[in-house]
Amino acid sequence: MKQVTAILIGAGARGQVYARYAQEHPEELRIVAVADPKADRRELVCHTYDIPDAQAFESWEKLLARPQMADAALICTLDDMHTEPTLAALNRGYHVLLEKPMSNSEEECKAIAAAASQAQRVLSICHVLRYTPFYRTIKRLIDDGEIGEVASLSQIENVGYWHHAHSFVRGNWRNSEKSSPMILQKSCHDMDIFVWLCGQRCVRVSSFGSLQYFNEAHAPKGAPERCTDGCPYNESCPYDAKKIYLSDNVGWPTDMLTTDMSLEGRLKALKEGPYGRCVYRCDNDVVDRQVVDLEFENGVVASFTMTAFTTDMARQLKVCGTKGQITADMNTNTVILHRFDEASPRIIELETPPQTNNYGHGGGDYYLMRDFVRAVQNEGTANLSSAQVSLQSHLICFAAERSRIEKRVIEL
């Protein structure tokens, strides 16, 4: 197979995760250019992938103004900056890997899917959960008829109290206007899993949820704007930024603060940047818990719960069928099949393949990249998370958010 060349647009945390595939499999993928507004990120990528300075750009516009210089574009910008570079890259002839969500606009999602079809290019959306051994095992059991006809599904997404504070209170995805609603940004993964496991079109959605806790009303008396401003609650507050970001851990989430991982560099970032703010005094507006109920074309029903208020960060799934049930916990990487005609359940303990150790989402990041590279190598063969497939889950998310706000059932 030929080596695929790629440009990286957006060199933040997600962009660097996907680009890592080129480090570990240089015979398959090579990063040849980068675009990012932050100079330190550009320098890091150039150093890591031996990219000349002339191939580093301050913006995607400057990069894509050049003639096509690679086979593919990895587009990992923030949510509200997905559509324009994706359409421009497709127009230039690039195959595209696009971080989810496709867009924070329903019409733009449809436009992206249509553009990919017209351009006859691979456009893979980063619905990484489809690629995990965990969910692939569940899908295989369902397709093999082990539990008969699927009747219902329920999934819980435990975001984790500190993860929610990091990403959705202080971080890039805290504000639905600047980013996306929580159901779209975080939980389009889960809607995609429902669609994939059901194999049917969703026809009806209802949803409830709100921002309950991370707001000014819950700020302790006398708490300052920043954790670094002498907060009297530092010792007792689980969200104290100094405890979270000034420990010995310099990986995620600490590496989101700055590229300077010295204690002084991190403290400076907390004093000046968004991650040092009090969690009760931010400009966040996304929900901190939400439930969604769905009905599919074949009558299958599904329920989903997302909550910030957990100690663990994992998904749990239950699939009930006419001949048995599947219960699964991503935290323990265990899938349990209990057929009604068998006295004892079958316990499937999944191992994490060693090649996925440097990736997230239960190995999904690694297998997504492998699938994308192979699709490009094969000149555009269909992949597991194409834009046309991913569009369905995005439409469910937009409907769920309308239902939550308008307090009514939405027909799709």
Task: Indicate where each model-derived feature is located.
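N-terminal Rossmann-like dinucleotide-binding module
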Residues: M1-I51
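Beta-loop-alpha module in the N-terminal Rossmann-like domain of NAD(P)-dependent dehydrogenases
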Residues: G12, I51-A115
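Catalytic cores of eukaryotic secretory-pathway lumenal/extracellular enzymes that build
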Residues: A13, T83, E108-K110, R130-T132, ...
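C-terminal helical cap and adjacent loop that interface with cofactors, partners, or active-site loops
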Residues: Y49, V286-L412
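Hydrophobic residues in well-ordered beta-strands that form the structural core
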Residues: L98, N104, L123-I125, A328
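Rossmann-fold dehydrogenase core element
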Residues: A111-V128, G148-S152
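Predominantly a Rossmann-like dinucleotide-binding segment in NAD(P)-dependent oxidoreductases
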Residues: L129-R277, K407
